[in-house]
């Protein structure tokens, strides 16, 4: 009689370290391996405490920016719909304003904003939707932004500037004026369509849907030998704090100096005005002098006539201060880029105004978090003669 040794049948293995999804039958006598993954009914609360310990940048903005004030300004300009006769009630204005700020802080589409609100805990906390069973969908976000329009976003920008003044960050030490190109999707037209558009006519074979998808306001321009298509954003920045104080928009083909007067801030405590080589003109110099401003505009060499050494040194001196205006543009680029995907100049103005507003909001929150004194005057470095005298007496 032949005896066959058989291994006794093993019961299902239900070790939570090895098989957190349920009991399984191991293949052989595998040792129990421990895992760093821990399952807890209170995992959300533990994760929330971890986030608070690490620091949530959105909560810094929520703590230091008065969104109720911003919402009040919007409600005064665009009152909420009356729902006493029925219909779904609208979302609170403070929630929608926070959503728009999130959209432009992260350069998100309306579809991505909806998804991120459903997926990200930090977005839900910032928009006061942590305990909400529903969030605004993409259509709600789009319609709300359209309802605000240029007037609503301009009011948001001005209300943010009012908060700057409330905290003492007034425009000081002069102002810097500059413009930047804001690219937009390139439009393609046939020769016949372009000829009609140049005459101010719309091709008859365009359907209403096709017309809505064609941006007829954006223009082309060339800069440093490279072609651009889109719009232009002109801003005025105060030298001391680098907040955007004035803003206006135009098309890419417009010259930088076209909107100089619109972004000139008469509320700055200093009368110094800085600008690059695209702004000098005899008429502008006379205008600034008549208004009591001190002109610091870099000179551009005429064709065939180089600048003198004195003019070159003056340009270098101005450039040290004028370079501060490039920081807001770089920060906007860091927030997701300046490319806009809207149709028409009105919507482009809304997008560019929101970019500038979000830049000021983010910078103000950082200033208040770090305790930056609005009236702090940095100590100047000692002169060479003072250094030599101190060394000789040592």
Language model features with spans:
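Charged, often Cys/His-bearing segments associated with DNA-binding zinc-finger transcription factors
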Residues: 2-76, 367-394
